Regions:
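Flavin-dependent oxidoreductase catalytic cores
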Residues: 1-166
Length: 166
């Protein structure tokens, strides 16, 4: 929605661009940041635990109110209560969840079955990023892993447990 760098595009610029795109795109996915500086990159490269959850929700709400295109929002949204609130409040039409699904691959099923308390939460440590493609980060290249889901990145080494029936 905004680059957060001097001279970068703003939320107003984004709304103007979205209005131009009306009738030509199916969905606007709202995020913030830029790779133009380390500070702005913190908003782009998966918000860490030091960022508030859902830090893009307000911009998504502003964009949704201004245009007639479905809006999705991303950014530290792995908690079931937050996902429900975004949709219920009309802040966005859809939520984009990545790290939350790495931590808990069955997040949609657990929410749909009425068991959000069983969701293994993403702790937003960003250990899942491989850092092979992210500029401005000093991390060594390695295979992606998850601090709370030990199977992630090793699915071929683990077989799905079979439930016995009585």
């Amino acid at each position: 929605a905004a680059e957060h760098i001097p001279g970068g595009y703003t939320i107003e610029d984004t709304i103007s661009m979205c209005r131009i795109l009306e009738g030509n795109v199916d969905l606007i996915n709202v995020s913030n940041g830029s790779f133009g500086s380390r500070e702005a990159a913190k908003l782009t490269i998966g918000s860490s635990i030091f960022m508030p959850r859902g830090h893009n929700i307000e911009e998504a709400r502003q964009i949704k109110q201004a245009i007639n295109i479905p809006v999705s929002v991303v950014g530290g949204l792995g908690e079931p209560e937050l996902l429900e609130e975004i949709i219920a409040s009309g802040s966005a039409d859809m939520v984009s969840v990545a790290r939350g699904l790495i931590a808990e691959p069955f997040l949609p099923e657990k929410m749909a079955s009425g068991h959000p308390e069983d969701v293994r939460p993403c702790i937003r440590c960003n250990y899942c990023f491989s850092h092979n493609y992210i500029p401005l980060t000093p991390y060594p290249k390695r295979l992606p892993r998850c601090a709370v889901n030990p199977v992630f990145g090793r699915e071929d080494q683990f077989r799905q447990a079979q439930c016995s029936t009585h």
